[in-house]
Regions:
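Short tryptophan-centered beta-strand motifs in secreted/extracellular beta-sheet-rich domains
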Residues: 114
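Active-site/pore-lining binding-face segments in mid-to-C-terminal subdomains
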Residues: 178
Length: 263
């Protein structure tokens, strides 16, 4: 059985109480047909999540699902959090949350769109942030030792003076975000979203041998938005690359044809 974690928008309940963005869980036996089975539990004590939480990355270590996600709705103060679960549904928050936000003059201090992968006996945390003017979205990376508990003190920001990837190609416009990373034969491949949502957002690929220095594989998008009238006319974005233990790789992505009114 496979579990998928994905963002769901906020809503106002029948009592008029507003609920922020959250994370839902779906299950599948074939990676194609999915059934929603619930939502990641909110934690009233986690006041840093009071406006919502979203953009999950799930990492299985032993018999535990580790969830890395972002706070939502706090602008420059949004940061990466960590929680864990043994059933995949009910999660315990890390007491040191938020576990990461970047320093350095090149960014605004924000961190979203977490992606965590173990590589060369370290854990690499990829994140998106913006420039101090809050216009350009870029990618950074932090590392933690192999024996980490994923606490705040374990993460060392490697992007102290510059991003590891920033928009440079015409189709990337003002944004690179939503990185998802896979290892093949000792090489890392990053699938990333170029341009902001519905600009249109499309998917590119970069590669690295050390997890820090990256080079694009293609000048054009690896996965484009759809033709006019198709379901993903407005974008093909926020990718996730999944290495199935049976040997196949699956690329998940979001799309819409309503300029972001739904996904």
């Amino acid at each position: 059985q496979y579990l998928m974690y994905y963002s769901v928008p906020g809503y106002t309940d029948k009592s008029g109480i507003e609920h922020g963005w959250g994370i839902a869980v779906a299950k599948s036996t074939d990676l194609v047909n999915w059934e929603r089975v619930g939502e990641v539990n909110a934690d009233p004590a986690a006041t840093y999540e009071s406006k919502g939480f979203a953009a999950p990355c799930a990492l299985v270590v032993g018999d535990t699902v580790h969830l890395f996600y972002q706070t939502y709705g706090n602008g420059r103060n949004d940061a990466i959090c960590h929680a864990w679960s043994t059933d995949g549904i009910t999660f315990t928050r890390n007491k040191t949350n938020p576990v990461f936000k970047p320093g350095g003059d090149w960014n605004c201090g924000r961190a979203i769109d977490a992606e965590v992968i173990r590589f060369k006996d370290k854990y690499f945390l990829y994140y998106a942030t913006r420039d101090p003017e809050y216009k350009i979205q870029m990618q950074g990376v932090a590392i933690a030792p192999a024996n980490t508990s994923f606490n705040r003190s374990d993460w060392q920001n490697m992007s102290t003076t510059a991003p590891i990837l920033k928009p440079e190609l015409p189709w990337e416009k003002d944004c690179i975000e939503g990185a998802s990373v896979i290892e093949k034969n000792g090489q890392l491949y990053m699938f990333y979203a170029g341009a902001y949502n519905n600009a249109p957002q499309q998917v590119g690929v970069a590669t690295s041998s050390d997890g820090i220095n990256w080079e694009r594989l293609f000048v054009e998008p690896f996965l484009t938005n759809g033709e006019p009238g198709t379901w993903n006319e407005s974008e093909s974005g926020h990718p996730h690359i999944f290495a199935n233990p049976n040997g196949d790789d699956y690329l998940f992505f979001q799309g819409n044809k309503t300029n972001g009114k739904d996904w």
